[in-house]
Amino acid sequence: MPITVPRTIKYAFLSITKEALSNIIKHSNATAVSILMREHPALWQLVIQDNGTLQSPSATEGIGLENMKERIRKLNGTITFSCENGFSIFIAIPKNKKEESDL
């Protein structure tokens, strides 16, 4: 059965994925990228990981990452970044009835 994702979540995940891929190209020497979206009973999850290294410390402080944080905050979600074994973005957005009415 296909998963029906609320528009607000789709838009946020698409925008964040595009920004993450742009950052990987600009700031990493990655040779592989993994993008995983999951539906859990209580939340939506997006995980983006690469196997590269940061070319500059400022790569973790840019406007793109701030925009990601703001987008997820507006959806009452959480976003974390990790620089271990490449760069990773972990996002969780709780499901709620209002979002499901946006389908």
PLM feature spans:
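Short beta-strand/loop element within the Bergerat-fold HATPase_c
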Residues: 32-42
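Conserved catalytic core of two-component histidine kinases
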Residues: 37-39, 81, 91
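ATP phosphate-binding glycine-rich loop and adjacent ATP-lid/helix-beta elements
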Residues: 57-87
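Conserved short strand/loop->alpha-helix "switch" segment adjacent to the catalytic nucleotide/phosphoryl-transfer site
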Residues: 1-18
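Conserved DxG motif in ATP/Mg2+-binding regions
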Residues: 45-52
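Structural motif
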Residues: 29, 40, 83-85
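Short C-terminal beta-strand
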Residues: 87-97
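Short helix-loop "hinge" at the ATP-lid/N-box region of the Bergerat-fold HATPase_c
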Residues: 21-28
